């Protein structure tokens, strides 16, 4: 499974990737690190300020790394700014079903309220904006770009509206449910198909679903759902006890028949 994280500067992409690494034990690739390695080694004449050109240069490399990881059934978190809004066109469905996408952006209200805090935590190496240009207006423009370009093409953008650390913790919970829901749907489709290739493709999905269902995390997410504390538009069939129990039971029965 690939977790692809993008968004505006200072939205917590690296922090989210780190939290996911800690929770899922997946390694992660920083596109910024790849960028600086190529620039410092003289492999390109581009500079860190050449945002659009860097996206055109870096994305073909990153997308093929993603395909290779999927083909090798490896897990990877990929994080960075240089992901085009139409990234899906570069992957067939067999790849897309193994990619979980997250885009982060801050609201104007959040920027107005927390600008000084954002500026204090800004990294001189990672920022896409010069210090002299780092104003509330420039930061809003950067976030508007991600909100507009990604929503225009049909992608969901997660808006940061509360204190960053709290937002990241809440986001991690929501993305965990979305991610498991994606695995749940992959497994449902494969079990319905019953072909050997389909069942082989969901082996990891079923293993992760089984681990999730038997963990305290599932109980916490289930309790949050029962209490009405999850977004109403969040699809969460994976939090149906009958649904996930039946799925895992059906998978085991099919595997027994094929032995």
Give, region by region, the residue ranges found by the protein language model.
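Glycine-rich phosphate-binding loop used to anchor ATP phosphates in small-molecule kinases
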Residues: 54-96
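ATP-binding Walker
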Residues: 11
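A glycine- and Lys/Arg-enriched "phosphate-lid" helix/loop adjacent to the NTP-binding pocket
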Residues: 99-143
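Hydrophobic anchor at the beta1->P-loop junction of P-loop NTPases
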Residues: 5
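Walker A/P-loop
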Residues: 14
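Conserved substrate/cofactor phosphate-moiety recognition/catalytic segment
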Residues: 18-61
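NTP-dependent small-molecule kinase module
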Residues: 144-175
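P-loop (Walker A) phosphate-binding loop of NTP-binding proteins
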Residues: 8
């Amino acid at each position: 499974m690939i977790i692809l994280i993008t968004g505006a500067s200072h939205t917590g992409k690296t922090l989210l990737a780190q939290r996911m690494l800690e929770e899922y034990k997946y390694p992660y690739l920083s596109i910024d690190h790849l960028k600086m390695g190529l620039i410092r080694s003289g492999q390109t004449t581009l500079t860190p300020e050449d945002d659009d050109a860097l996206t055109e240069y870096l994305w073909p490399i990153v997308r093929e790394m993603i395909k290779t990881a999927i083909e090798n059934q490896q897990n990877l978190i990929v994080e960075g700014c240089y992901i085009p809004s139409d990234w899906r066109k570069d992957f067939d469905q067999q790849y897309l079903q193994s990619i979980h996408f997250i885009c982060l952006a801050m609201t104007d209200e959040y920027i107005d309220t927390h600008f000084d805090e954002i500026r204090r935590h800004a990294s001189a190496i990672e920022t896409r904006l010069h210090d002299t240009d780092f104003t509330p207006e420039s930061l809003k423009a950067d976030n508007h770009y991600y909100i507009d370009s990604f929503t225009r093409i049909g992608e969901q953008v997660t808006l940061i509206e509360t204190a960053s650390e709290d937002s990241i913790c809440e986001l991690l919970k929501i993305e965990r449910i979305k991610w498991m829901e994606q695995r749940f749907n992959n497994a449902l489709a494969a079990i319905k198909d019953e072909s050997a290739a389909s069942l082989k493709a969901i082996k990891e999905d079923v293993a992760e679903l089984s681990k999730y269902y038997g963990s305290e995390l599932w109980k916490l997410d289930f309790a949050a759902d029962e209490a009405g504390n999850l977004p109403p538009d969040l699809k969460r069939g994976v939090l149906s006890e009958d649904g996930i129990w039946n799925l895992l039971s059906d998978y085991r029965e099919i595997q027994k028949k094929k032995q």
